[in-house]
């Protein structure tokens, strides 16, 4: 998978400092970066950075993403963390602890197709 454009735009030290500051200021929130998968025909999201409540489920967060990209109900959306489709009932806090990046952010990619084929 291509390197996140957020990672390309911001050096590691700056991302680490920002994530640490966010976690300190908002201990019950998770810093998440959401980006569209390459070659996906789904709309672009208007903002990449989210402060997500730790007790939100993946399914609830998918709903937030759907709203942000104004995706119609009949269109599918898949959210991946490190090319894996996380369970919709999983807590964002658990996904964060398991998959957070070295910079302290959780990176999620969304697509209109199940591009990676792993459940």
UniProtKB/Swiss-Prot annotation:
The keyword Disulfide bond does not apply. Disulfide bonds: none annotated. Keywords: Autophagy, Cytoplasm, Cytoplasmic vesicle, Cytoskeleton, Lipoprotein, Membrane, Ubl conjugation pathway, Vacuole. Residues 118-119 form a propeptide. One of its GO terms (molecular function) is phosphatidylethanolamine binding. InterPro entries: Atg8-like, Ubiquitin-like_domsf. GO terms for cellular component: autophagosome membrane; cytoplasmic vesicle; cytoskeleton; plant-type vacuole membrane. A lipid is attached at residue 117 (Phosphatidylethanolamine amidated glycine). The keyword Cytoplasm applies. It is found in: Cytoplasmic vesicle, Autophagosome membrane; Vacuole membrane; Cytoplasm, Cytoskeleton. PANTHER family: MICROTUBULE-ASSOCIATED PROTEINS 1A/1B LIGHT CHAIN 3-RELATED (PTHR10969). Ubiquitin-like modifier involved in autophagosomes formation. May mediate the delivery of the autophagosomes to the vacuole via the microtubule cytoskeleton. ATG8CL-mediated selective autophagy contributes to defense against the fungal pathogen Phytophtora infestans. This is Autophagy-related protein 8C-like. It comes from Solanum tuberosum (Potato).
């Amino acid at each position: 998978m291509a390197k996140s454009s957020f990672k390309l735009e911001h050096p590691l030290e700056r991302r680490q400092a920002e994530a640490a500051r966010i976690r300190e200021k908002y201990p019950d929130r998770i810093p998440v970066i959401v980006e569209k998968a390459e070659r996906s025909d789904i709309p672009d999201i208007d903002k990449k950075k989210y402060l997500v409540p730790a007790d939100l489920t993946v399914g609830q967060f998918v709903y937030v993403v759907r709203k942000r990209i104004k995706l119609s109900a009949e269109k599918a959306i898949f959210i991946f963390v490190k090319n894996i489709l996380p369970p919709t009932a999983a807590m964002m806090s658990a996904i964060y602890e398991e998959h957070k990046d070295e910079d302290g952010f959780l990176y999620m990619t969304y697509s209109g197709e199940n591009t990676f084929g792993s459940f």
